[in-house]
Amino acid sequence: VPRTPIVTSILALLLALPLAGQAVPPAPVPIHSLGGQDVPVLPITLVAIDPAFDSDTLFASYREHRATLTWADSAIGRALTERAPEVKWVLPPRLRKLARRAAGLVDDPDEMGQAMLRSPKLKELPDQLKASLRNLTALINGRIVFVPAALGFSRDPDGQVRAELSLVAADARSGRILWRSLPAAVGATPSAALTSALAAVLPQDQ
């Protein structure tokens, strides 16, 4: 994942909000509202890594952009299916297959511009994204879409890795953003930090 001034600015935008409100627990995934439904999970398209990790061997395996996105998709999908099995999650690999079969009617799930949903100012889906998601959900007779909008890694003051996520659920028909959460967690490795951040919004006692 490239570390440039642009990445640094994205990190600042993504991480500032959770850091400002750590006393408030992140909003949990609304599992009870989604139970029994087919819910597509869009691929993540933005992973920002603090430039401070440039020479850190801990991040050596996360420097290839596509591989890092695939890893993040896998971790998110695993957490959703293991911790919220009552929802019929339609994960990125299947979404891509469905989109390929409906080429010309459905946009590529990796190129819908979903990272823009990390902005807390958005209350409605932008028109083009709304149209893309409406077409996508029609393939599975769904309505609600789960969007991992962005993932950021930074160095915690105690030296651990800090993972911060921007997660959104939206109604593809009405265009309304129904839920937003900004979980954050620390861990000895990027994988451990991300796993803990996901667990924060997927508590087992919901």
PLM feature spans:
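C-terminal/domain-edge helix-coil "capping" segments
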Residues: 22-53, 72, 112, 124-143, ...
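Positively charged n-region of N-terminal signal peptides that target proteins for export
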Residues: 1-4
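Generic secondary-structure transition motif, activating predominantly at the C-termini of alpha-helices
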Residues: 18, 80, 84, 103, ...
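N-terminal segment of the mature soluble domain
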Residues: 54-142, 146
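Bacterial N-terminal signal peptides
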Residues: 8-20
